[in-house]
């Protein structure tokens, strides 16, 4: 019996989100197993996975030789290897790149479509899950396991949980929360990631940006002390030579349409508008507000005014829940 996804509804902001169970169809799970798995993944991503405990998950980038990101990966340990979650639109291309050198190592890299990805967020999310699972993650233990389920804890923009589980547990959870929780699709989790300033790399932006252009250093996703990995030289140069002039920004406001990933924005310059930046993700909330995650110059004025191209409405900068000060 397959897991049936949930119909879409406009997402809510974290501040006014009721208890919500979210089907994460736009994200995908993959694994690497085998005796060489840690050594192999360590040589491919920006974070130092050798320092990761069983109770941690972290965001890392998988880059090309020029330091441009194929994708960002939400990594955690699993059995004799690692699992990671990324946007489904980049899955195939990212796995192809990751497997390029696998023939020389004792590893198996594969997508995992057997398991289900769910988000639980909103009002009293912890209390709702405590009725179902015997243990829940928190700031100290960000990853816990309960039977067939792995639960990941997220602090921002408000406490929320990501579940990696089997079909039976997913259906059981849906049934238990029926009537108590709203059901929504990936757009709700996307809205929360945008609010949290977690970079969303879809196919349109794969291979376009170095990690620092999406604030990955501020999210603990880059180690400048670990050994070699693909793209390391360019990532290090951006830090030590100050070569990175871009950052990830959160914008909010109104627009007559929801722009696509890869589109640019327009910045108000006196009476005129100038094209700028690249949109990573955007979504419209249930109150009509548009949230936009974009990579733009890192020296923008806080009161800068933007718009979706040729739109009559405007967008403004919203502070992120973390600092970019090094």
UniProtKB/Swiss-Prot annotation:
One of its GO terms (biological process) is RNA modification. The keyword Ubl conjugation does not apply. One of its GO terms (molecular function) is folic acid binding. Folate binds at residues 27, 189. InterPro entries: GcvT/YgfZ_C (IPR029043), tRNA-modifying_YgfZ (IPR023758), YgfZ/GcvT (IPR045179), YgfZ/GcvT_CS (IPR017703), YgfZ_barrel (IPR048451). Its main location: cytoplasm. One of its GO terms (cellular component) is cytoplasm. Keywords: Cytoplasm, Folate-binding, tRNA processing. It comes from the Bacteria. SUPFAM superfamilies: Aminomethyltransferase beta-barrel domain, Folate-binding domain. The keyword Transcription regulation does not apply. It is found in: Cytoplasm. NCBIfam families: PRK09559.1, ygfZ_signature. Folate-binding protein involved in regulating the level of ATP-DnaA and in the modification of some tRNAs. It is probably a key factor in regulatory networks that act via tRNA modification, such as initiation of chromosomal replication. Belongs to the tRNA-modifying YgfZ family. PANTHER family: TRANSFERASE CAF17, MITOCHONDRIAL-RELATED. This is tRNA-modifying protein YgfZ. It comes from Salmonella dublin (strain CT_02021853). The lineage of its organism: Bacteria, Pseudomonadati, Pseudomonadota, Gammaproteobacteria, Enterobacterales. The gene is ygfZ.
């Amino acid at each position: 019996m397959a897991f049936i996804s949930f119909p879409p509804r406009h997402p809510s902001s974290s501040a006014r989100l009721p208890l919500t169970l979210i089907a994460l169809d736009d994200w995908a799970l993959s694994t690497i197993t085998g005796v060489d798995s840690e050594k192999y993944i360590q040589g491919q991503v920006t974070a130092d996975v050798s320092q990761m405990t069983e109770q941690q998950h972290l965001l890392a980038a998988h880059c090309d030789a020029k330091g441009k990101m194929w994708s960002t990966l939400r990594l955690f340990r699993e059995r004799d290897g690692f699992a990671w979650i990324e946007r489904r639109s980049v899955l195939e291309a990212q796995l192809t790149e990751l497997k390029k050198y696998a023939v020389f190592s004792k590893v198996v890299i594969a997508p995992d479509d057997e398991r289900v990805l769910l988000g639980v967020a909103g009002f009293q999310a912890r209390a709702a899950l405590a009725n179902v699972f015997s243990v829940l993650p928190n700031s100290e233990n960000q990853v816990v396991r309960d039977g067939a389920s792995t639960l990941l804890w997220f602090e921002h923009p408000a406490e929320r949980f990501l579940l990696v589980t089997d079909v039976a547990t997913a259906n059981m959870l849906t049934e238990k929360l029926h009537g108590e929780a709203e059901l929504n699709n990936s757009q709700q989790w996307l809205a929360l990631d945008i609010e949290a300033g977690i970079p969303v790399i879809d196919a349109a932006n794969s291979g376009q940006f170095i990690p620092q252009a999406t604030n990955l250093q501020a999210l603990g996703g880059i180690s400048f002390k670990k050994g070699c990995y693909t793209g390391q030289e360019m990532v290090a140069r951006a830090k030590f030579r100050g070569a990175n002039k871009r950052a990830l920004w959160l914008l909010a406001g109104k627009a007559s349409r929801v722009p696509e990933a890869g589109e640019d924005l327009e910045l108000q310059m006196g009476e005129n508008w100038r094209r700028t930046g690249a949109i990573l993700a955007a979504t419209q909330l249930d109150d009509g507000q548009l949230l936009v995650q974009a990579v733009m110059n890192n020296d923008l004025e806080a009161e800068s005014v933007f718009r979706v191209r040729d739109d009559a409405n405007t967008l403004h900068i919203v502070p992120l829940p973390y600092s970019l000060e090094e």
